[in-house]
From Swiss-Prot:
Region forming the signal peptide: none
Subcellular location: Cytoplasm
CDD domains according to UniProt: GrpE
GO BP annotations, alphabetical order: protein folding
Known partners and oligomeric status: Homodimer.
Name of this chain's protein: Protein GrpE
Spans annotated as Disordered: 1-40
PROSITE patterns associated with the record: GRPE
Lineage start: Bacteria, Pseudomonadati, Pseudomonadota, Gammaproteobacteria, Enterobacterales
Family of the protein in this entry: Belongs to the GrpE family.
Family matches, as SUPFAM superfamilies: Coiled-coil domain of nucleotide exchange factor GrpE, Head domain of nucleotide exchange factor GrpE
A cellular component annotation (GO) from this entry: cytosol
Amino acid sequence: MSSKEQKTPEGQAPEEIIMDQHEEVEAVEPNDSAEQVDPRDEKIANLEVQLAEAQTRERDTVLRIKAEMENLRRRTEQDIEKAHKFALEKFVNELLPVIDSLDRALEVADKANPDMAAMVEGIELTLKSMLDVVRKFGVEVIAETNVPLDPNVHQAIAMVESEEVPAGNVLGIMQKGYTLNGRTIRAAMVTVAKAK
């Protein structure tokens, strides 16, 4: 026997063995290439992920900016509305001492004296027309008695015992208060009833 015949497995010719070895090599090669990933495909997949993340960030940014713009628009409208409503506040604050002076003049005027009747009537008409004008611009007088004390519109100066007015209610007005479009610009100075 030759050396080739000794090494061959039984029943197989040497050519068959060589062909089998080539088939095994060929069969292995396609498996190796299937396991290998093309670096371009991997890079494309990474870029697609990055693109999706960037698009999500961009959408979030756009939505956030839209919300901020809407909030800014709303705040600006509110600020403008308040500016229109309360633009007169300084002016009204300057008028209040004049109104107070007319009120005091009426309180101390001798209404029984016929010589003073014309002057008292003039002061009353002046005060009435001034209050009518400021009411047109949203100013309201706080001068009610026998109402519960409201710290938003009343400033308690003293407590006085009273049987006619329930405890905790306004008994008397020391100085009138005023509101401008619902905002207190000067609280009324009041005396408050307390139980005996």
